[in-house]
Amino acid sequence: ELQACRDGYIYIHDMSARRDTMNCCLFDVEHVLKGGFEMGNLWYNEPKTLNVAFDVIGDIVLSAASQQYGGFTVPSVDLLLEPYAERSYKMLTEKYTRLGLDADTVEKEVMADILNDFEQGFQGWEYKFNSVSSSRGDYPFITMTAGTGKSRFAKMATITMLDVRRKGQGKDGHKKPVLFPKLVFLYDENLHGPGKELEDVFEAGIRCSSKTMYPDWLSLTGEGYIASMYKKYGRIISPMGCRAFLSPWYEKGGMEPADETDVPRFVGRFNVGVVSLHLPMILAKARQESRDFYEVLDYYLELIRKIHIRTYAYLGEMRASTNPLAYCEGGFYGGPLGLHDKIKPLLKTATASFGITAFNELQELYNGKSLVEDGQFALEVLEHINEKVNQFKKEDGNLYAIYATPAENLCGLQVKQFRKKYGIIENVS
């Protein structure tokens, strides 16, 4: 394994961190907030107003995100904030009514106050998540998704979040959009299309996109896996951080639905780590040694499988006290656990990923053509990897997944590793 890593045939992401904690997640903030929770040996009551909810959620996110090394996502933040806006509405209406104001003035003042709370809250998050480092010493990769809430306050949440990002932060005349939280717009053509009830929310997203690189747009009603889960079950799969999407875990049946009424669960689940294949190097090795490519590929797939099995076993021995908000206060599905309980029961719904990179270079090395010109071999390889990973899932009972590794930095390393072993090949290295 170490030699495979050194040579570059596989790459273990976050090698040191993966032995301490999990990777990325869809954190269930709603479950943590409901009824109150404990954080840092202090009891927090559930917020009674919107502005307090913003403060408390910000604290939860920074605390929990510091206990992991991958992307931290708060899914459907518009629906998360909606009940706290309703509480503020009720409280403010009673307050202004007691002052003897007429009903129209009360409504106007209350809605203005709630809008201001949303603006200040989202602005506060932007400052907090980009200037307050976590206890790990870095700035966590925080993502928030929104866009499907239909109530007036859910819509107000999404629109205000997008407007705050569009306007940017900083000195007058020098404002620029911040990095975190990364925003993802959940697009449903039946809600956001022309003349539909959330068209104004869609327009706010377009205005934001016209000025910034945000939000990312995730189609819930297009084609593919994400859309299929939404169309069949009405369940949204938000990305964990940047672009990692969870495989389904069914509430009754686990990896497979138990019956027609079984539904998948995504919120509150996480990933335990990624190990990526270096496919062009594996093909080059097979050719140099006059061996069957798939035989060599299977060797490295088995290597990754063993690493994942050990990761599940190692993490399973850890205690819930290593991340109390996640394991003990409801942030992760399957809890809450006691502080001294092992986290093994929660790992059954967690994914471990086989990363894939450089398919274009693989195809170029195979026959000198790009994916656009041919691509058949690359597709066959991906189908083979998919079959093997599904086989491993059934045999091991672990929820393995395939991950298209972004490889922003890894790609440079992989080129150097390829050159060192196999030299410079046009359109490959």
Report each predicted region and the residues it spans:
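Conserved catalytic cores of very large enzyme subunits
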Residues: 1-348, 365, 369-429
